[in-house]
Amino acid sequence: MNLRRKNRLWVVCAVLAGLGLTTALVLYALRANIDLFYTPGEILYGKRETQQLPAAGQRLRVGGMVMPGSVRRDPDSLKVNFSLYDAEGSVTVSYEGILPDLFREGQGVVVQGTLEKGNHVLAHEVLAKHDENYTPPEVEKAMQENHRRPQRADKDTSS
């Protein structure tokens, strides 16, 4: 092997090593920003495909319904404790802050936070789901004013 090919081989190896190191560093940096979505049942029994349980201390998002009768507010602060449930189980959630206006018992919510021991989620953010059928009053009024029924396709309009 001549000197020119040997130098080219070293350059290619250095570039590949640099790309590998860059990829590893990017993935390591993004690891802290990945929040996996779980339901309460998946926290208790694991993901359906892998049966993998989330670890205590893991950042995650949990989606479920607020269990009726479970909301407990601290009278001296903004702390709120409640339970999220689905068809397979429930988990407790603690949150300190102002809850969304649409938050209420029996309503769907998504909480983002950290899983603690005992299937307890320390939430940093609470997002309330709104009704997918909701239409603002202004839009509904405009739709009613501009609504025309389409003609039936099977009706003969030539006569």
UniProtKB/Swiss-Prot annotation:
Keyword S-adenosyl-L-methionine carried by entry: no
Residue intervals on the Periplasmic side: 30-159
UniProt entry keywords in alphabetical sequence: Cell inner membrane, Cell membrane, Cytochrome c-type biogenesis, Heme, Iron, Membrane, Metal-binding, Signal-anchor, Transmembrane, Transmembrane helix
Transmembrane segment boundaries: 9-29
Keyword presence, DNA damage: no
Subcellular location: Cell inner membrane
Membrane topology listed for this record: Single-pass type II membrane protein
Source taxon at top rank: Bacteria
Membrane-side (Cytoplasmic) residue stretches: 1-8
Main subcellular location of this protein, as a coarse class: membrane
One of the record's GO cellular component terms: plasma membrane
HAMAP family the UniProt entry points to: CcmE
Family named by the database record: Belongs to the CcmE/CycJ family.
Protein name according to UniProt: Cytochrome c-type biogenesis protein CcmE
Source organism per UniProt: Salmonella typhimurium (strain LT2 / SGSC1412 / ATCC 700720)
